Amino acid sequence: MFEINPVNNRIQDLTERSDVLRGYLDYDAKKERLEEVNAELEQPDVWNEPERAQALGKERSSLEAVVDTLDQMKQGLEDVSGLLELAVEADDEETFNEAVAELDALEEKLAQLEFRRMFSGEYDSADCYLDIQAGSGGTEAQDWASMLERMYLRWAESRGFKTEIIEESEGEVAGIKSVTIKISGDYAYGWLRTETGVHRLVRKSPFDSGGRRHTSFSSAFVYPEVDDDIDIEINPADLRIDVYRASGAGGQHVNRTESAVRITHIPTGIVTQCQNDRSQHKNKDQAMKQMKAKLYELEMQKKNAEKQAMEDNKSDIGWGSQIRSYVLDDSRIKDLRTGVETRNTQAVLDGSLDQFIEASLKAGL
């Protein structure tokens, strides 16, 4: 005979948690807005404004993630209750086990939705840019920057995010000097914002014929993409715009025209650049978008006094602001802020970062 009371208690618990989320996530307003967005996307002329249509499509995906999940929770809990009744009436353990398995799946789905409460920042739902910069140390540091790039690309892929290399500077022997990656997806900035900081690698260097232990540093800087309708005033007189020929690995030029664009904001010293398109105009637009995002982040720093110290670290990462240590000799990766540690170093370097990211978000970093 199977024990039904614990299962009924779980159903009651999940129902209550689901009801709390409905209020917290403003289910009714989101459902109403989803209907409005769907109606707008069904209009035949919606694609006359492609950017508007894309924004609506993205909003719909975000709304559906909440509305559909909560709808599925409600229906799923009703279905499980029905299965339990059948199992009891027929004294059928197989049906009972099926109900428990469905309940497990529903609880996992609800836990994922509950985690969204970590994303309370104004721009947590935005796409983002990730800048990786090799520290001093030549080839070893540049190889480490390349390993970080691969790690974050793998992580983004595992979450279903879209990635685009905006700008990449190749290392002289191996690896990269720097890279800017655009990461697009639901709550991309919210997920990655706590990854800003210095990452420290300790290993026996493959570039050292003596196989000696080396310590290398690379920094990561995450900032949100700012919508075009955000009011950031940029005085054209404050900008220096340089064009140059795009180059690939080894320094060879990949085209004969000066299509690559570098923009410098003279008052702040902020630099953005783009060379991933053959069109100079498109590269300039992308570089301006990044500049707008970086200047917006700077404004947010000024306005938010409580988080000033943390934001200063984001905009000017010092090599002392380490967030994570990767000691490959000892098979140990440790987050220096949360204390989370793992010995499965290869899995982390292959993109298994959620345990670190979730811990830092829960800690309110």
UniProtKB/Swiss-Prot annotation:
Protein name: Peptide chain release factor 2
Family of the protein in this entry: Belongs to the prokaryotic/mitochondrial release factor family.
Biological process per Gene Ontology, one example term: viral translational frameshifting
Keywords: Cytoplasm, Methylation, Protein biosynthesis
Modified residues (N5-methylglutamine): 252
Coiled coil segments of this chain: none
Keyword Protein biosynthesis: yes
PANTHER family in the record: CLASS I PEPTIDE CHAIN RELEASE FACTOR, PEPTIDE CHAIN RELEASE FACTOR 2
GO cellular component, one term: cytoplasm
Cleaved signal peptide residues: none
PTM notes: Methylated by PrmC. Methylation increases the termination efficiency of RF2.
Purpose of the protein: Peptide chain release factor 2 directs the termination of translation in response to the peptide chain termination codons UGA and UAA.
An MF annotation (GO) of this entry: translation release factor activity, codon specific
NCBIfam families, per the entry: prfB
More info: The gene for this protein contains a UGA in-frame termination codon after Leu-25; a naturally occurring frameshift enables complete translation of RF-2. This provides a mechanism for the protein to regulate its own production.
Compartments, as annotated in UniProt: Cytoplasm
